[in-house]
UniProtKB/Swiss-Prot annotation:
Its main location: membrane. The gene is nuoC. SUPFAM superfamilies: Nqo5-like. It comes from Rickettsia conorii (strain ATCC VR-613 / Malish 7). Keywords: Cell inner membrane, Cell membrane, Membrane, NAD, Quinone, Translocase, Transport, Ubiquinone. Belongs to the complex I 30 kDa subunit family. This is NADH-quinone oxidoreductase subunit C. It catalyses: a quinone + NADH + 5 H(+)(in) = a quinol + NAD(+) + 4 H(+)(out). NDH-1 shuttles electrons from NADH, via FMN and iron-sulfur (Fe-S) centers, to quinones in the respiratory chain. The immediate electron acceptor for the enzyme in this species is believed to be ubiquinone. Couples the redox reaction to proton translocation (for every two electrons transferred, four hydrogen ions are translocated across the cytoplasmic membrane), and thus conserves the redox energy in a proton gradient. It comes from the Bacteria.
């Protein structure tokens, strides 16, 4: 029996709903947050699979992501109604369609030493939702979850350790969110009077600039060596040699 069939059989046996998704070179599934812990536990304890290592756990932010909740394998139904979140669109008069904007993607990367195989599990949540912590199944999840919280503000239910792990303790916001300003909210400097590091509002010493790389003033007019994307050789401008 192939690996995907074994996993789908395990999910069906435990009444866990999973949906196959396409990820290059990897076997991957999408799952709803309420099924995450039972699925992780089943994968770890299965004698046939033995996905005993959580090698990575990370997040991504897609603000316009409209992933709709769906019933996957291991369930009698063929589909499920999406959960209403923030927006409702109408295609026809008198008919409305709800869209669940799940902007955050949390990815679990599992490894089976027995099979020498990797498995990717993706969970999608909205800003107001939480994900159950996997600490009691994989102890390594604690620091991974702290990193995802630090970078994106995703809360893991059951993990009360909200200490910053990559940024400093007084950092404001979550820097990998798409709505986080490029300049940040505060800047750090060493205060000679206080004899310690101090935080203050961002004060740019020079005007904030947006570089237009399509302008010949800021980009080379010749094809860069090794640029496989270049199809035509751009004529050299005056004063610029190929």
């Amino acid at each position: 029996m192939t690996l995907d069939k074994l996993i789908e059989k395990l999910a069906a046996k435990s009444s866990i709903l999973i949906t196959p998704i396409t990820v290059k070179d990897y076997l991957a599934y999408k799952i709803e947050p309420n099924f995450l812990l039972p699925f992780l536990k089943a994968l770890k304890e299965s004698e046939e699979l033995r996905f005993t290592l959580l090698t990575d756990l990370f997040g991504a932010d897609f603000p316009q992501n409209n992933v709709v909740n769906s019933v996957g394998l291991g369930h009698k139904e063929q589909g499920a109604k999406p959960i209403t979140n923030r927006r409702t669109t109408s295609d026809n008069v008198g008919e409305s369609k709800s869209i669940d904007y799940k902007r955050f993607e949390v990815v679990y990367n599992l490894l089976s030493l027995k099979l020498n195989k990797r498995l990717i599990i993706k969970v999608y949540i909205s800003e107001k939702e939480t994900i159950p912590s996997a600490m009691n199944i994989f102890s390594a999840a604690c620091w991974y979850e702290r990193e995802v919280y630090d970078m994106y503000g995703v809360n893991f239910e059951g993990n009360d350790d909200k200490r910053r792990i990559l940024t400093d303790y007084e950092f404001e916001g979550h820097p990998l969110r798409k709505d986080f300003p490029l300049t940040g909210y505060t800047q750090v400097k060493y205060d000679e009077k206080l004899k310690k590091v101090a935080y203050e509002p961002v004060d740019l010493d020079i005007e904030y600039r947006e570089f237009d790389f399509s302008s010949h003033w800021h980009s080379p007019s010749y094809v860069l060596p090794g640029d496989e994307k270049a199809t035509d050789v751009i004529p050299a401008k005056a004063g610029i040699q190929k």
